[in-house]
Amino acid sequence: MVTPCPASPGSPAAGAGRRDSHQNLRAPVKKSRRPCLRRKKPLRPLNACSLPGDSGVCDLFESPSSSSDGADSPAVSAARDCSSLLNPAQPLTALDLQTFREYGQSCYDFRKAQENLFHPRESLARQPQVTAESRCKLLSWLLQVHRQFGLSFESLCLTVNTLDRFLLTTPVAADCFQLLGVTCLLIACKQVEVHPPRLKQLLALCGGAFSRQQLCNLECIVLHKLHFSLGAPTINFFLEHFTQWRMEAGQAEVTEALEAQTLARGVAELSLTDYAFTTYTPSLMAICCLALADGLLQHQHEMDLRLGEHPEATLQDCLGKLQTLVSINSSSLPRILPPQIWERCSLPQSWQ
């Protein structure tokens, strides 16, 4: 580094020298690399719904396994303005079909082998305070929350699976059941959603009955009880697999296959609230929902029930219960299905 020549302090040259030296010797200042924090967007307001009950839990759908006379529950009409339509299945791209050709069968075999490991049977056997009716009410409320946030069907399936598997391990008090449902929804959304709901939003849905610390503590308990084993095969996975298989094998037109998948998702959504359907595996439920959807849409090429290699008696038993479920909720289905799908449905007179 070159040092300027010294000058007397009182001379003008000294002052000029100081100014020049300061200008010449000034080192470039590096700007601090602080992270550029974006301004947080305000919480998206949720549409308020006047639902019965102080906890926000309501029964949106009727269950064949519960005591009902086949009429819609009062909460169905109360939540009519709060429910959004089920998004129709998106058209498959050439990349999706190519990926299915290369990895579809391998993924199916892997998921099918894991099915029994993640399938909770008789989840309420050890629950003295949680009943099938309270489970139906909680999941009906969670369905409404799921639509309100615009979450994927995969996250809903994982929520129900996490809930039932935890109920197998730990008795739950009735006053903590809603907190458990919200916790399972949060765990599921963290797995598959790009933008999961915030804790503040989920706690607000519970009417301020629970704290942030309670939710975080219960989340840790659920994860430890399940040994952090969360990647369960879902109905959504098998619905997508069988739909792609039908199109690849030429057993259904693309439009018909996607319409059947959308309707099958709506039927499967209803079945998640009914404890009677927990005895069936997700792959069997997917096949039966697609077969029922083909029948309601009057498709020429119906779903091959032998595809999943399930017993014929079990398939027919599941189909019969699904028909009963759809007949009971025939007035509720139009509010959870896209209009263009529901208009094409043809329900038998005996179901209406």
Swiss-Prot record:
Any matching Pfam family: Cyclin_C
SUPFAM superfamilies to which the protein is assigned, alphabetical: Cyclin-like
Record's GO cellular component terms: centriolar satellite; cytoplasm; nucleolus
Tissue spec. comment: Present in respiratory cells (at protein level). Expressed in multiciliated tissue in brain and fallopian tube (at protein level). Highly expressed in oocytes.
Residues with the Phosphoserine modification: S83
Biological processes annotated in GO: cell division; cilium assembly; mitotic cell cycle; multi-ciliated epithelial cell differentiation; seminiferous tubule development; single fertilization; spermatogenesis
Superkingdom as given in the UniProt entry: Eukaryota
This protein's UniProt keywords: Cell cycle, Cell division, Cilium biogenesis/degradation, Cyclin, Cytoplasm, Nucleus, Phosphoprotein
Chief location of this protein within or outside the cell: cytoplasm
Ranges annotated as biased composition (Basic residues): 28-40
Subcellular location as annotated: Cytoplasm; Nucleus, Nucleolus
SMART domains hit by this protein: CYCLIN (SM00385), Cyclin_C (SM01332)
Region (Disordered): 1-40
Keyword rRNA-binding included in the entry's annotation: no
PANTHER family, sorted: CYCLINS
Family recorded in the similarity comment: Belongs to the cyclin family.
Role of this protein: Specifically required for generation of multiciliated cells, possibly by promoting a cell cycle state compatible with centriole amplification and maturation. Acts downstream of MCIDAS to promote mother centriole amplification and maturation in preparation for apical docking. May be involved in apoptosis in lymphoid cells; however, this result requires additional evidences in vivo. May be involved in oocyte meiotic resumption in oocytes.
Name this protein carries in UniProt: Cyclin-O
Species this protein is from: Mus musculus
Name of the coding gene: Ccno
